[in-house]
Amino acid sequence: MKAAITSWADEVEADYVDGLPPSKEYVDGDYKHVTEYKFNDEGKKIKVVRSFKIEKKIVSRAVAKRRNWVKFGDSKLDKPGPNSYTTKVADEILMNYMGSKDFEHAQDPLDAGKPMAKCRICNGEHWSVKCPYKGTSMDMESKAIAAATAAVGETNKTGKYVPPFLKDGAKGRERDDSSAVRISNLSESMTEDDLEELVKKIGPYTKMYLAREKNSGLCKGFAYVHFKYRKDAAEAIEILNGHGYDHLILSVEWSKPQN
């Protein structure tokens, strides 16, 4: 008669009726194997076998001394090293995950309403190079100043702040062109992007105007660039005057004040 085959769980239960058997561990070369017994969520006894690779590290004297401290409390009988049941080796970090709808609500509604681009010519919500009034920007500048000057009379009654260039007598002042240069002998295919690429390496500028034909939209052959600093304008004249560009020789000079 053959002996009945029993599982390891039945053998453990027969030897340890009142509880789980103690954990066992043994070292095999550079590896340590630990066998533990515990109950799972269904109340059944299970065996957990874990393998650890042993590594030797050089630590400071303070760390080595701290590892030899006598344990106390629930960890009084624990072996050297942290116990996952009583010790946390890292700080607990709580994270809140946001969905796509929560992210949309978290955005500032004021920022969402701001335009991505603003035209320097007509203040529209587009780039200056795509402005439909680009060919008549010089005329629009004088009209915009006249309209703003007329609006000052109404804003003065409400006590609002009036910029210095719009106060009484300011419209008679001459425009500051001390840092403006005139670039001529440009090709018909010249664009604002080409002009910006030509001058941006010299220094920062505050305004740029490329003269174009109304009907064809081609370049008239000249442009104006207002640099932020006069020394950069002088450097632009020195570098670009007589410089070859698009099979033409550029002519760069100081911009003459308008009469």
Curated annotation (Swiss-Prot):
Keywords: Cytoplasm, Initiation factor, Protein biosynthesis, RNA-binding
KW Lyase (keyword) present: no
GO cellular component: eukaryotic 43S preinitiation complex; eukaryotic 48S preinitiation complex; eukaryotic translation initiation factor 3 complex
Domain of life assignment: Eukaryota
Chief localisation class: cytoplasm
InterPro entries attached to this UniProt entry: eIF3_g, eIF3g_N, eIF3G_RRM, Nucleotide-bd_a/b_plait_sf, RBD_domain_sf, RRM_dom
One Gene Ontology molecular-function label: RNA binding
Domain RRM per the UniProt entry, residue ranges: 179-257
PROSITE patterns on file: RRM
Pfam families for this protein: eIF3g, RRM_1
Localization terms from the record: Cytoplasm
GO biological process terms held by the UniProt record: formation of cytoplasmic translation initiation complex
Entry annotated with the keyword Cell wall biogenesis/degradation: no
Family designation: Belongs to the eIF-3 subunit G family.
Function statement: RNA-binding component of the eukaryotic translation initiation factor 3 (eIF-3) complex, which is involved in protein synthesis of a specialized repertoire of mRNAs and, together with other initiation factors, stimulates binding of mRNA and methionyl-tRNAi to the 40S ribosome. The eIF-3 complex specifically targets and initiates translation of a subset of mRNAs involved in cell proliferation. This subunit can bind 18S rRNA.
Subunit structure and binding partners: Component of the eukaryotic translation initiation factor 3 (eIF-3) complex. The eIF-3 complex interacts with pix.
Name used for this protein in its record: Eukaryotic translation initiation factor 3 subunit G-2
Gene: eIF3g2
